[in-house]
């Protein structure tokens, strides 16, 4: 049991239009969803999951959380016990707290950073496919 990889990062942005423009046109990310709260979800072209970056409107820039992906949903319960045994409070967030994402284990480190673990997120595949793929999409802009 262990963490597979960083699944997504959620950041606060003060100018959503400028941020989306930067991530799409300069870095080449792709918007995959916008929710009713004004959050914008983006993915890199070689990402398999629905999103890897969440932009949240805010009056100051900063990080909301970093989410790590684990292999199985059942591992979240074991991680909850392990994290709590280390003296860190946790909260299990229900499926759908974030769009297209299963339940998540949320905890805050003594440093004040908010982390989450999850196992399930909608799988959409890459922009180049997996059978003899091009090294990058034809329309990449970043």
Predicted regions mapped to residue ranges:
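Loop/turn position at the start of each blade in beta-propeller repeats
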Residues: 4, 61, 100-102
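Intrinsic, low-complexity N-terminal interaction/targeting segments
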Residues: 51-54, 84, 95, 106, ...
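Conserved short beta-strand elements that form part of the metal-binding/catalytic scaffold
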Residues: 30-64, 114-121
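Vicinal oxygen chelate
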Residues: 13-17, 68-111
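Core segments of cupin and vicinal oxygen chelate
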Residues: 1-4, 10-49
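N-terminal, well-ordered alpha-helical segments
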Residues: 7, 21, 38-40, 53, ...
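N-terminal beta-strand motif that seeds the catalytic metal site of vicinal oxygen chelate
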Residues: 1-17, 63-68, 123-142
């Amino acid at each position: 049991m262990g963490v597979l990889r960083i699944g997504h990062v959620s950041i606060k942005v003060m100018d959503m239009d400028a941020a989306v423009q930067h991530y799409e046109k300069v870095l080449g990310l792709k918007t995959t969803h916008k929710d009713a709260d004004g959050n914008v979800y983006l993915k890199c072209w070689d990402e398999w999951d629905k999103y890897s970056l969440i932009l949240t409107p805010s009056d100051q820039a900063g990080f909301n959380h970093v989410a790590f992906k684990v292999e199985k949903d059942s591992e979240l319960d074991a991680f909850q016990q392990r994290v709590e045994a280390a003296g860190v409070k946790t909260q299990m967030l229900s499926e759908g707290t974030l769009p297209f994402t299963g339940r998540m284990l949320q905890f805050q480190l003594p440093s004040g950073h908010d982390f989450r673990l999850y196992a399930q997120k909608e799988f959409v595949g890459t922009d180049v496919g997996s059978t003899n793929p091009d090294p990058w999409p034809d329309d990449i802009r970043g």
